[in-house]
Amino acid sequence: MSPEAIRREVERALVSEQVDLTSESGRARAERLIEETLTGLRAAELAGPEGARDGRLAELGRELRDDLIGLGAIAEAMLADPDAQEWMINGPRRIFRDSGERIERVTGIAFADDRQLRAFLERLLEQVEGKRLDRITPRIEARLPDGSRMTAAIPPVSSNGHPICSIRRFRLGASSLAELEQLDFLSGQAAAFLSACVRAGRNIVVCGRVSSGKTTLLNALGREIPAQERVVVCESSAELQLPRLLANCIGYEARPGSVDGLPAVGLEELVGDALRMNPDRIIVGECRGAETMALLWSLATGHAGMTSIHGESAEHALKNLVRFALTSGARIEAEQALDWVSEVEVVVHCDRPRNPPGSEHGFRPRQIDEIVELSGAEGSRPTLNPLFEGEGRSLAWLGVAPRFAAELRQAGFEPLA
């Protein structure tokens, strides 16, 4: 009997008995069925010369247990890779891996067909309560138990005819400003400045393109928050580690509506709830819509805050904040929106620079390349005061005192002295 025939026999038995592999008892029954099938094969092997060897049967048993009871051999290989920052699955045999330095096609990992790929996605989603991928919900976004972010879709939403998936993992290798300095993400002087900004309660926006290190930097900044502060974190998909790391910190995670009738819980609502939790500081993981105005309102009422936003530069990020504030439903004009955005004090831009075509590595290391103060507005444009110049380890203080210079001195930022 071929390995595939053995697999089909076990799967038929599981379907026949309606075994629920998401339950502990169901997985125990699957374990027994696998062992019973392999025991029968060993007996058949003793009765005649045809058949697999014991070593092959043992290997097949491990594969069946991985695929039917665990996450599967492919999933285990992917999630165990210490250098992979993102997996991009464009079909059963079109799999790409982003190591941070380059994006390359993987040849050693493949699914047999769409059916096995669907089973892989469903097995991952079994770990996430309330998430499923089917005809009713053909696209999902979910946070896996290890913190990875999974986005997936199936046909017809996936127009290439196959299930597709992206699994983004956070593997910059740093959780503090000191560790980011060791990775040349920023200079020691810039780290000291940002730490002082956090301790002084300044309002900070971290910006950059996709996968530029925004979430990692926001996490590191959060670790600089004084222990006596109460912090509330609001996210569309929980990625920040601060509720686990800070003693007086709680986290909210938005929830989409479900086909079972569960109502959606939006990020805008959660920021409103956060204001009623007696916070000293509110952190919104990323501003992309109506939650922007809710955050700006919290800043205007005296709460310190931080967030991240997509932006090709500090100025572009602030323009996006204005745009998002205008789409929030609040009846305000552009100049009024800019006035709300002026509650932001410091903008930090992260980058993941591309190398020239033909280079061995597609990308240079992630780094901060801009730290500015939002000092006001001229008409419909924000007025920016550059505070640091350079990139990564070469970021240097320009000696320009921001409006909150006195607070920075009290927080111990010495270059202002």
Task: Describe each model-derived feature in a short phrase.
Residues M1-L133:
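N-terminal accessory targeting/assembly segments
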